[in-house]
């Protein structure tokens, strides 16, 4: 049998088992654990003189209707919270992931995975020197401006979850779309945006009828926010409706402790599944000890990207952010005191440590309301790297690689938000049958700038050169919408998630929606144990004077880094 060197193989087909990949300019290295392509020597590859040719790697007679793939991503390195770090061909058909394995022509190739047959209907992406992840999900979005979609796609985010109606004061502070009319208008508006949406209704009501009204009008879940009164009574009422209608509830708790302390809010949850925003408290919530929520098995904790990783300037920028977002006046002492109560360096530093331990399960952006929607993937990988440098290897990592740590942070922006919202059966990981929302990255730009963003199996967003050039690559290179972002293809490759109540009442027909409309499900049975690679339940103590955080009796702190990877090397500003 003919043999080639490992270096030659990597040049031709990319890395394989045992090879390591550095992620950007970070100190994070992933190592390929498995190669799902069966055997060496029968690799499928597109290009001149390559194997994806008729009668070779391309089956002669199979039609698309009979199962031929629409798209194959060949020889790609998959980094996925469920799959791990693996080498595979990935097949896509009818907008869904068919599977991972060995693609090609079973008449001429050994070990072709069932369903991954290529033929005349198949196009190709050469993944030999690329990394594939699931599209990211931003679980904390203020719908302030539709242009947020462009920034989100430019960092590999393919699903937005939040609420709002534009740059009004309520939306600047709260991620809810309030009432049936506003919900209808937003559902109509997002028809033209090439990204998945879930809209949260206002959960601040002790009356049941207004909450049900939100769900029947198309809300996919609820948000209870302190600006509208996050009282125990409102929380209990909202959770009761959520239990009946199977939708998620997110809560931004009471910073001022006016209606109770963190223990009172936890008691109001009554053991029911709830997603706590700003679990570190800097973005709002019970001061100073909201972090205690990360030790509860029914609470699904997230935090937002402005304080991740905690750098030397993180604390300094928070005060002005809070004043603007929550309609506060720097001339009013009580408003200033409110803002200052959130800015606690000790709890902000502990946030990064708790993420690294898997105690905080998700990362969102808090878009234009303290956070940056185009940096959610980026901040996740930056935090992973900063924590490796500060805390060393994780106990779960194998010698010589950072696979577990990287996968832990990938889970925070992919599968865990999807599970929390009740859409984990549709998106969030690279698994057979799921919607083909996928992101391709060059290793040098991993987490920073994707190469291609696929929505429903079609390219929606890409780093594209001059359209008048002789090649796709001449300058100016910048992100541009692709064909999945135009025409009726947009509606076939993007999903609007709604409650089952709205779905059953025909919300799509009532509002004339052309996008794919899907109901959420399974939200009330999700607990911390379901958070992939992020299910740790520590005992948290917060000193009321110094704000020092102890995790299982150990002070949780690191020195803020003076410089951060994946940062100024990659950006002009």
Swiss-Prot record:
- Report residues binding Ni(2+) 2: 223, 252, 278
Q: Which UniProt keywords apply?
A: Cytoplasm, Hydrolase, Metal-binding, Nickel
Name the major location.
cytoplasm
Q: According to its UniProt record, how is this protein modified after translation? A: Carboxylation allows a single lysine to coordinate two nickel ions.
Q: Which residues are annotated with the PTM N6-carboxylysine?
A: 223
Matching entries from InterPro entries are given as: Amidohydro-rel, Metal-dep_hydrolase_composite, Metal_Hydrolase, Rhodanese-like_dom, Urease_alpha_N_dom, Urease_alpha_subunit, Urease_AS, Urease_asu
Residues binding substrate: 225
User: Molecular function (GO) terms listed?
Assistant: nickel cation binding; urease activity
Q: In which pathway does it act?
A: Nitrogen metabolism; urea degradation; CO(2) and NH(3) from urea (urease route): step 1/1
Q: What are the names of the required cofactors?
A: Ni cation
Listed CDD domains: Urease_alpha
Record-level GO BP terms: urea catabolic process
The record's EC number reads: 3.5.1.5
Name one cellular component (GO) term: cytoplasm
Compartment annotation? Cytoplasm
Active site, per annotation? 326
PROSITE patterns for this protein: UREASE_1, UREASE_2, UREASE_3
Q: Which reaction does it catalyse?
A: urea + 2 H2O + H(+) = hydrogencarbonate + 2 NH4(+)
Q: How is the cofactor bound?
A: Binds 2 nickel ions per subunit.
List, for all copies, the residue spans of the domain called Urease. 135-573
Q: How does it assemble?
A: Heterotrimer of UreA (gamma), UreB (beta) and UreC (alpha) subunits. Three heterotrimers associate to form the active enzyme.
> Main role?
Disrupting the ure2 operon has no effect on urease activity, or pathogen survival in BALB/c mice when inoculated by gavage, but confers slightly enhanced resistance to low pH killing in vitro.
Do you know which NCBIfam families this protein is assigned to?
Answer: PRK13207.1, PRK13309.1, urease_alph
Protein name from the UniProt record: Urease subunit alpha 2
Species assigned in the record: Brucella suis biovar 1 (strain 1330)
Q: What is the lineage of its organism?
A: Bacteria, Pseudomonadati, Pseudomonadota, Alphaproteobacteria, Hyphomicrobiales
The gene it comes from is: ureC2
């Amino acid at each position: 049998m003919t043999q080639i060197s490992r270096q030659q193989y990597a040049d031709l087909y990319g890395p394989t088992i045992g090879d390591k990949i550095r992620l950007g300019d970070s100190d994070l290295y992933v190592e390929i654990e498995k190669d799902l392509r069966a055997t060496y020597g029968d690799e499928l590859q597109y290009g001149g003189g390559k194997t994806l040719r008729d009668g070779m790697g391309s089956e002669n007679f199979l039609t698309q209707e009979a199962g031929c793939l629409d798209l194959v991503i060949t020889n790609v390195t998959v980094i996925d919270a469920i799959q791990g770090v693996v080498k595979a061909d990935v097949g896509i058909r009818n907008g869904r992931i068919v599977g991972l394995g060995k693609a090609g022509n079973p008449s001429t190739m050994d070990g072709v995975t069932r369903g991954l047959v290529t033929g005349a209907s198949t196009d190709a992406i050469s993944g030999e020197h690329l990394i594939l992840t699931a599209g990211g999900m931003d679980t904390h979005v203020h719908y302030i401006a539709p242009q947020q979609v462009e920034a989100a796609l430019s960092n590999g985010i393919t699903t937005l979850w939040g609420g709002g109606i534009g740059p009004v004061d309520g939306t600047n502070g709260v991620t809810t779309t309030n009432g049936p009319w506003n919900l209808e208008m937003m559902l109509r508006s997002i028809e033209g945006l090439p990204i998945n949406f879930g809209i949260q209704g206002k959960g601040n009501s002790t009356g049941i009828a207004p909450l049900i009204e939100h769900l029947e009008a198309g809300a996919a879940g609820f948000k209870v926010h302190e600006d509208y009164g996050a009282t125990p009574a409102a929380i209990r009422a909202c959770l009761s409706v959520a239990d009946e209608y199977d939708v998620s509830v997110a809560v931004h708790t009471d910073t001022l402790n006016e209606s109770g302390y963190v223990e009172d809010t936890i008691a109001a949850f009554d053991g029911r599944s709830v997603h706590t925003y700003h679990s570190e408290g800097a973005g709002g919530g019970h001061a100073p000890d909201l972090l205690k929520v990360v030790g509860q098995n029914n609470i699904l904790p997230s935090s937002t990207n402005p304080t991740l990783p905690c750098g030397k300037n993180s604390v300094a920028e928070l005060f002005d952010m809070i004043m603007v977002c929550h309609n506060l006046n720097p001339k009013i002492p009580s408003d200033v005191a409110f803002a200052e109560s959130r800015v606690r360096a000790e709890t902000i530093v502990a946030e990064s440590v708790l993420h690294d331990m898997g105690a905080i399960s998700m990362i969102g952006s808090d878009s234009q309301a303290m956070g940056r929607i185009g940096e959610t993937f980026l901040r996740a990988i930056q935090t992973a790297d900063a924590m490796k440098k500060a805390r060393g290897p994780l106990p779960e990592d194998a010698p010589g690689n950072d696979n577990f740590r990287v996968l832990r942070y990938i889970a925070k922006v992919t599968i865990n938000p999807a599970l929390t919202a009740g859409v984990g059966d549709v998106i969030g990981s690279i698994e057979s049958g799921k919607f083909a929302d996928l992101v391709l990255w060059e290793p040098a730009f991993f987490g920073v700038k994707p190469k291609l963003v696929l929505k429903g199996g079609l390219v929606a967003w890409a780093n594209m050169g001059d359209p008048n050039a002789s090649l796709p690559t001449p300058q100016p290179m910048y992100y541009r919408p692709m064909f999945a972002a135009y025409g009726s293809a947009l509606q076939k490759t993007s999903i609007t998630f709604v409650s089952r109540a709205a779905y059953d009442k025909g919300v799509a027909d009532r509002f004339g929606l052309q996008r794919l409309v899907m109901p959420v499900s399974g939200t009330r049975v999700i607990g911390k144990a379901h958070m992939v690679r992020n299910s740790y339940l520590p005992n948290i103590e917060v000193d009321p004077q110094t704000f020092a955080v102890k995790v299982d009796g150990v002070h949780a702190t690191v020195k803020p880094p003076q410089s951060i990877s994946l940062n100024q090397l990659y950006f002009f500003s």
